[in-house]
UniProtKB/Swiss-Prot annotation:
The keyword Glycoprotein appears for this protein: no
Assigned protein family: Belongs to the phospholipase A2 family. Group II subfamily. D49 sub-subfamily.
UniProt protein name: Basic phospholipase A2 PL-X
E.C. number: 3.1.1.4
A single GO molecular function term of this UniProt record: calcium ion binding
Described function: PLA2 catalyzes the calcium-dependent hydrolysis of the 2-acyl groups in 3-sn-phosphoglycerides.
Organism ancestry: Eukaryota, Metazoa, Chordata, Craniata, Vertebrata
Source organism, top-level taxon: Eukaryota
Matches recorded under InterPro entries: PLipase_A2, PLipase_A2_dom, PLipase_A2_dom_sf, PLipase_A2_His_AS
A Pfam family recorded for this sequence: Phospholip_A2_1
Disulfide bonds: 26-115, 28-44, 43-95, 49-122, 50-88, 57-81, 75-86
C-alpha cells in the first residue's frame, strides 16, 4: 500500500517521501518514461518494473504486513501477491537509502517533458 511504502521510505532515508520522491526524475511517482536520471531515479524504475511483475492485485492499494527489526524491513507471511509487493517496496526503500549521497535536489520536481530519451525495458 502506498502509505506503507511511504513509511518504509521515511524510515530508511529520513526524508519526507512525498516531497522528496513523488516527483523525482523521470520514474518516481506516477508513470515513467525515458532514461532514469540517476541512481535514485533508477530505484523508481526498478520499483515500477517490480510492480509490473506482480499480477492479480493492485500493488498500490493492497495492504501487506511488515515489521522493522533492528532497522531492517521484514516482510510478513502474507499471501504471495502481497508479500511480493512488500518485497518490491522494501527493495526500493533500501535503494533510496543506499543512494542518498547522490540524491540531487534539481531532480526533485523534474518536469517529465524533459524525459525524452528512449524508454528502457524492464
Amino acid at each position: 500500500h502506498l502509505l506503507q511504502f511511504r513509511k518504509m521510505i521515511k524510515k530508511m532515508t529520513g526524508k519526507e517521501p512525498i516531497v522528496s520522491y513523488a516527483f523525482y526524475g523521470c520514474y518516481c511517482g506516477k508513470g515513467g518514461r525515458g532514461k532514469p536520471k540517476d541512481a535514485t531515479d533508477r530505484c523508481c524504475f526498478v520499483h515500477d518494473c517490480c510492480y509490473e511483475k506482480v499480477t492479480g492485485c493492485d500493488p498500490k492499494w493492497s495492504y501487506y504486513t511488515y515489521s522493522l527489526e533492528n532497522g531492517d524491513i521484514v516482510c510478513g507471511g502474507d499471501p504471495y501477491c502481497t508479500k511480493v509487493k512488500c518485497e518490491c517496496d522494501k527493495k526500493a526503500a533500501i535503494c533510496f537509502r543506499d543512494n542518498l549521497k547522490t540524491y540531487k535536489n534539481r531532480y526533485m520536481t523534474f518536469p517529465d517533458i524533459f524525459c525524452t530519451d528512449p524508454t528502457e525495458g524492464c
